[in-house]
Amino acid sequence: MRLATPLLKPDATLKNFFHYKSRFADIINLVCFDGQPILSRNSLSNEDTDMSTVFDFDEHPISFNAYRDTLVKVSVGGIYALIAIENQKAIDYHIPVRTFVYDASSYKKQYQDYLDEKKWNKEAKLKLIPIITVVLYYGERKWSGPRTLLDMMELPEEMKGIMNDWNTHIIDVKELDASLLTDKDNRDLIEGLQMFYKWQGDLEFFKERKMSRD
């Protein structure tokens, strides 16, 4: 397996990488379900990553154009959910807002689909499919940015118990236990990234190891 070259952007490379269902199921099983085999490739279907929508505010529509890196519909016990992976190399100090807007756009799209169906099916009922967004961070530094919306706010003590929050599931690939991955391509990717960053900090690391030319 080849990692990104100077002609290939890492985000684009990883986007295509996790488009494969077996890889997606394996990484999500590790980061979301403690390595339990909750998902399998047969329980997944790739979804449209276009999150573009229009928000109406007091008759002043605001268009929002964005694309997810990877979006998959999963089935767990016959119940559907949407899981998105966003690949992040740099620390983004606005990422809770970004993922909040992405998820809100997904719910908005589901609501619009319901309204469209309601026009010809009066029996249609609104039942939202839950959405989970996982951010795979593979930057050199330890993540120092906010993880929730509340991390970005200063609140009066009286409001801290009633303010809605939005958690961003940020996973630092440098901290993953690659041995728990069952997909070989995933193990090669995560171990390769971890070795790369360890090599940057310790030149003796690679001297003690014979590296494949592939």
Residue ranges and their predicted role:
Residues 1-214:
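Elongated, amphipathic alpha-helical interaction scaffolds
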